[in-house]
């Protein structure tokens, strides 16, 4: 199964675009108090050699990279939860720095898909008080629509799926935060951004069309992401380690 590609002349981001986007996000200081949880799903049925030891001793790079770039973009309240370390994690009960989480980012490989679905469903149990739910990782990149209308009730699913790398997430956050009023829940700002059509201009996203209904959902795919050419634009990979949730039940 091969993913589509952009034209050779349009594969990469313009040099400097990544760092410029992080700098613009640093200027949006009203958003820096958002509580962001990055959850890495893990299915314990997949624990087997040769990964028996490494799976519980190594923090995956993907979620650490997200924390690195969010920290470099000015966000202060970040936490990475690894389900292999904290198997009973429930987003609906999660509190970060004394407050419920505002954004839940779920990352999963294909073999860990089922627990990732349950993380999304659990967050949706909060109803109107639920966080903005974003899905990503290999599972989401290849089968993004599996995260929409997951049931058992209508409307249960992720708000948006990133089918690209970290820059796609930065562009999404920037677009939503520009539409966000002071003190407004970020999920409300996302809904308004989605209805405005702004998200259609960000390659690498999949979300439900605002004109679709729960009984006939229609997904919008904004196209193939652009890739980062100069990896020196990435921040130092240290903040991700500092915001790891320690192992506990």
Show the residue positions of the predicted features.
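Eukaryote-specific, low-hydrophobicity, charge-rich regions
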Residues: 37-42, 70, 78-79
């Amino acid at each position: 199964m091969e993913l589509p590609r952009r034209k050779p002349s349009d594969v990469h981001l313009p040099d400097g675009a990544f760092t410029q986007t992080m700098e613009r996000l640093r200027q949006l200081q009203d958003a820096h108090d958002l509580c962001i949880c990055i959850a890495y799903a893990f299915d314990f049925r997949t624990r087997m050699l040769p990964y028996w030891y490494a799976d519980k001793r190594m923090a995956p790079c993907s979620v650490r990279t997200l924390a690195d770039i969010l920290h470099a973009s000015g966000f202060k309240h970040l936490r990475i939860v690894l389900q292999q370390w904290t198997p009973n994690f429930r987003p609906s009960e999660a509190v970060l720095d004394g407050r419920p989480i505002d954004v839940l980012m779920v990352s999963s490989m294909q073999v860990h898909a089922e627990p990732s679905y349950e993380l999304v469903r659990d967050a949706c149990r909060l109803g109107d008080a639920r966080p903005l739910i974003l899905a990503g990782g290999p599972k989401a990149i290849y089968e993004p629509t599996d995260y929409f209308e997951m049931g058992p009730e209508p409307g249960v699913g992720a708000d948006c799926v990133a089918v690209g790398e970290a820059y796609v997430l930065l562009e999404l956050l920037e677009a939503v935060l520009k539409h966000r009023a002071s003190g407004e829940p970020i999920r409300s700002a996302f809904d308004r951004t989605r209805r405005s059509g702004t998200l259609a201009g960000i390659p690498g996203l999949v979300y439900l069309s605002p004109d679709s209904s729960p009984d006939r959902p229609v997904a919008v795919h904004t196209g193939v992401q652009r890739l980062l050419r100069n990896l020196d634009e990435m921040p130092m990979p240290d903040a991700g380690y500092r915001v790891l949730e320690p192992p506990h039940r």
